[in-house]
């Protein structure tokens, strides 16, 4: 059932569906994907329903969505979005390796988080800011988002041994990974590749 619902939510990206039908569907079956949640928020807003802002904020913080939906949602929510909402969205976009949307999101992140996000965005785009001699925020070695993006970039560019060393020598994490599935999948991918080479 979950797979069918996910496919139905993905179909919303390709088809024009009336807001009342979208809202009725998601009222009965809560969204399983962030693009679905974003479409639900827009449908609720079009119908003038009070929960549109709450659902919209959750979708904004949840990460990637269709570019048109992203623009519509931002236009609708701009007055109520807080700086931490923008930082949460940027973190989710970087976990999803959504480089193009993350580049747009940089305009809205807090100054305190900007350097770390820029470093991670470079990694998502396949560039290693440290190798280019750019200064790195010192607190990143304990940040799961940075470690995920860096290990992934190293592994996908053929530097599995460096990725394994990074993950093996890291200090304890300062917070839980935003996306535990991606975190575990990357740890396993690095371990398997490193094991295959030894």
Model-derived segments and spans:
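Alpha-helical solenoid repeat scaffolds
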Residues: 1-198
């Amino acid at each position: 059932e979950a797979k069918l619902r996910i496919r139905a939510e993905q179909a919303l990206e390709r088809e024009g569906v009336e807001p009342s039908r979208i809202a009725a569907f998601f009222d009965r079956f809560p969204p399983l994907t962030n693009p679905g949640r974003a479409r639900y928020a827009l449908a609720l807003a079009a119908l003038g329903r009070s929960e549109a802002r709450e659902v919209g904020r959750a979708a904004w913080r949840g990460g990637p969505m269709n570019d048109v939906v992203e623009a519509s949602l931002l236009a609708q929510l701009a007055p109520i979005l807080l700086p931490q909402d923008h930082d949460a969205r940027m973190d989710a976009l970087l976990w999803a390796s959504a480089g193009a949307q993350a580049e747009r999101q940089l305009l809205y992140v807090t100054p305190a988080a900007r350097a770390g996000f820029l470093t991670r965005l470079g990694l998502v785009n396949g560039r290693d800011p440290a190798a280019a001699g750019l200064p790195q925020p010192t607190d990143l070695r304990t940040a799961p988002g940075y470690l995920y993006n860096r290990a992934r970039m190293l592994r996908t560019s053929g530097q599995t041994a460096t990725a394994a060393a990074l993950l093996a020598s890291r200090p304890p994490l300062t917070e839980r990974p935003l996306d535990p599935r991606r975190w575990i999948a990357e740890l396993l991918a690095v371990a398997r590749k490193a094991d295959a080479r030894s």
